[in-house]
From Swiss-Prot:
<feature type="region of interest" description="Disordered">
    <location>
        <begin position="109"/>
        <end position="140"/>
    </location>
</feature>
<keyword id="KW-0336">GPI-anchor</keyword>
<dbReference type="InterPro" id="IPR036312">
    <property type="entry name" value="Bifun_inhib/LTP/seed_sf"/>
</dbReference>
<feature type="glycosylation site" description="N-linked (GlcNAc...) asparagine">
    <location>
        <position position="103"/>
    </location>
</feature>
<keyword id="KW-0449">Lipoprotein</keyword>
<keyword id="KW-0732">Signal</keyword>
<feature type="disulfide bond">
    <location>
        <begin position="30"/>
        <end position="71"/>
    </location>
</feature>
<feature type="glycosylation site" description="N-linked (GlcNAc...) asparagine">
    <location>
        <position position="87"/>
    </location>
</feature>
<dbReference type="Pfam" id="PF14368">
    <property type="entry name" value="LTP_2"/>
</dbReference>
<feature type="compositionally biased region" description="Low complexity">
    <location>
        <begin position="116"/>
        <end position="132"/>
    </location>
</feature>
<comment type="similarity">
    <text>Belongs to the plant LTP family.</text>
</comment>
<feature type="propeptide" description="Removed in mature form">
    <location>
        <begin position="169"/>
        <end position="193"/>
    </location>
</feature>
<protein>
    <recommendedName>
        <fullName>Non-specific lipid transfer protein GPI-anchored 10</fullName>
    </recommendedName>
</protein>
<dbReference type="GO" id="GO:0098552">
    <property type="term" value="C:side of membrane"/>
</dbReference>
<feature type="glycosylation site" description="N-linked (GlcNAc...) asparagine">
    <location>
        <position position="76"/>
    </location>
</feature>
<dbReference type="InterPro" id="IPR043325">
    <property type="entry name" value="LTSS"/>
</dbReference>
<keyword id="KW-1015">Disulfide bond</keyword>
């Protein structure tokens, strides 16, 4: 019993360590907000046809509280890819599917920790809680073109959405393998309790 408790403690500690390593790449103000997008995982990894309602709720909350974090998620999906592989084409479909007036043209190509280069590039959050219109691109802004949406198949090399088997080199693949191992061992360890 003591050994299983020690094993569980070790696994949780290692999981937290690797999660902190991944989130260290994300600005501090966005890290906790982006964690709330976990319900979007099945959709942005190609395992679900539509995003779940908790995903849309979290996305809307991020958009209304910190739109730059939504921009970070949409423009820099590779930031979270070691632990949370994201298909950027699918991620860009989230705002219209969740009735959020943001799309790929909403954010300029900002980088982690950097605000968008144009103050008009982030649409203001909706002022009322009544249903918002789906944004299909720019309407009255001739300098911004609508972005076409392409349907992509899920990545065949992704195993259970953990990125196991992705072509990678160095410590990134080691982190992916470690996270995969933790995800495989943790449920079995919890059954021992």
């Amino acid at each position: 019993m003591a050994s299983s408790t020690l094993l569980i403690t070790l696994l949780i500690s290692l999981s937290a360590f690797f999660l902190r390593m991944v989130l260290a790449q994300v600005p501090a103000t966005c890290a906790s907000r982006l964690l709330s997008l976990a319900p979007c995982g099945p959709f942005v990894q190609g395992f679900a046809q539509l995003p779940a309602q908790p995903c849309c709720d979290s996305l809307n909350q991020i958009y209304s509280q910190e739109a730059t974090c939504l921009c970070l998620f949409l423009n820099n999906t590779s930031t979270l890819s070691p632990a949370f592989p994201i298909n950027q084409t699918l991620a860009l479909q989230l705002p219209p599917l969740c009735n959020i007036p943001a799309n790929s043209s909403t954010c300029s190509s900002s980088f982690p920790g950097e605000a968008p280069s144009d103050s008009s590039s982030v649409a203001p959050p909706p002022s009322s809680s009544t249903g918002s219109q789906i944004s299909q691109g720019a309407k009255n802004n001739s300098r911004v073109a609508a972005t076409p949406v392409a349907q992509m198949a899920p990545r065949p090399t992704s195993f259970m959405g953990l990125g196991y088997g992705l072509k990678s080199s160095g410590s990134k693949s080691e982190i992916q393998l470690t996270i995969f191992a933790l995800a495989a061992i943790l449920p079995a360890a919890l059954l021992l309790i």
